[in-house]
Structures are given as structure tokens and as C-alpha cells.
Amino acid sequence: MNKITAFFKLVRWQNLLMIALMMILVYHSLMSPLHACGVMGALPSALSFLLLLISLIFIVAAGYVINDYFDVEIDKVNKPEQLIVSKIFSETETKVFYVLLTILGIIIGAISGVIALNSKFYIILAILALLTALLYSYSSSYKRKFVVGNIIVSFSVAFAVFLPWLFVMLYLSDNVLILSSVRDVIISSSMSKLVMIYTAFAFLMTLLREIVKDAEDLKGDKLTRCRTIPIVLGIKKMNVILILSILLICMLLIYFTYVLYVMHSYITLIIMSLILLCLALSLTYLPRKDISYHKYSVFLKIMMLLGIISMIFV
């Protein structure tokens, strides 16, 4: 593996693409009532949004880098053939990558805030700095603590759905005349509700996948004394939690489709619910092998991607 390929693998380029897709679809699909309202300046400039997207991508990429830096010993046990830190990049090089990506992410985020929010740019800056600190804390300590690490990762992914909406609301709050012109559009449309629903969906699906990944990494986590859900509660209880969580997601999908009457996405959401139900049922008979959990992790990632793509039809 050459160093360029290794770097893209280190920053989890597929996950970064998914985050970028989430942000773009929230901005263009879920915010479509503001695009169509005909009010000049109803949304922040495309440049400011693009810079915000790049900023978040860099900060999340930095989070993946520092995670692998702290996980060297665990990865030597769980996936020695995929080891990057200490094998392809030295620990010093890895720390340099982390610092550069973090600094670039914060600076680009600040520029985005200045362009769109003027004097309120510090709010975006503070949010991005908090996210950076949260991802670092996760890798250095919280990852090894019961449930906390799973929640931090789930929050970080869900934040990619929530951030474009927050960015637009901050922009409008700083432009009172524009806000007064689009207030009725915001109130009458389901825009804000849909953003919250997709944020919750991203959080729950990521939480499920993180629990499954903990089961996949059971061997290495035990050796490094991590207190993950499968270690503390055991595989059987973990499977029960997964099944109940999947059923909860299915009920929420069907409920929100019914309440909002989003007919364009109805078929998509029902199909997703049925697939998730099959997944829940199969967990009852799941063999205790890492490869099986890896397959479930991939399935959950595909389901999340389908959920993101469904924004196009809302």
C-alpha cells in the first residue's frame, strides 16, 4: 500500500463522502422551500456553505487520524493486516496530519462564518472547536468507557445533518429583513421537522453500527481493558439491545412517514423498515463470529446511505 492510498484509508474517505453527501442533501433537498421561495438571499452563499462543508470534513478526518493514533495497540490485535499508524506512517507523522487537518478545519470554518454570519462567526467557530475537542476526548479516553464513546460518535455523525440547518438559521437570525420575508415559508413547510427526523435517524443508525463494531472488535478491546457494551453486558444482552433499537427505528420511520404524509418517500421508508426488521430477526440466530458482525456493520452502513439518499425524494 502506497502512502497516498494509506492516507485516504486513514481518514476513512468513504465516511467523509457520506458526510459530504448528507450536508449537501440537507442544504439542497430538505431546505428546498427556501430555495423555491423566490426571496433574494434566503440562504447563505454557496461559497460559505462549501467552506463549512470542507471545514467539517477536515475536522472529522482529523478525528479519524487521532483515533487510529490512540488505537495502535488495539488494531495490532483486531486488524494487524490493515494497520497504518506505526506500519506505514510513524506516530509523529500521524500527529502532524492531525494538527494540520484540525488547524485547516478551524480556519476554513471561521472564514465560512465570517462570510455568512458577519459578527456572529464566533458561534460556528465555537461549535467546530467543541466538536474537535469532543472527537479528541473520544479517542484518548471516552472510547474505552461504557456507552459514552458510542454516543459521542453517533452525535458527531448526526451533527453533519443538523449543522447545515443550524448554519441557515444563524444566517437568517443575522438578517432580520430576509427572515421576516421567509418566516411563513419556514413555519408552513416541514423543513425543520424533517431535519430533526433525519438527525435522529443518523444518530440511531450510527449508534447501532458502533455497537456492532464493538462486537467485531471484541478481542482487542478486551486486551486493552475497554468497557464496551458487548464486554460489559455480554453478546446475548447486546443482541437484545440491537433488536429493540432496530424495532424502535422501524416504528419511528413508519410513524413520521404517516404524520408528515411524505408520499414520495413512503415506499423507500417502508422498504427500509422491512429490511431492518429482517435484520432484527436474524440477530436472534447470529453466530458469534467476527465476520458475521462485520457483515451486519456493512448492512447498517448501506441502510444509512439509503436513508440519506431518500432526502432527494422528500
Question: Which sequence ranges carry the predicted segments?
Answer:
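Multi-pass alpha-helical membrane architecture of UbiA-family
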Residues: M1-V314
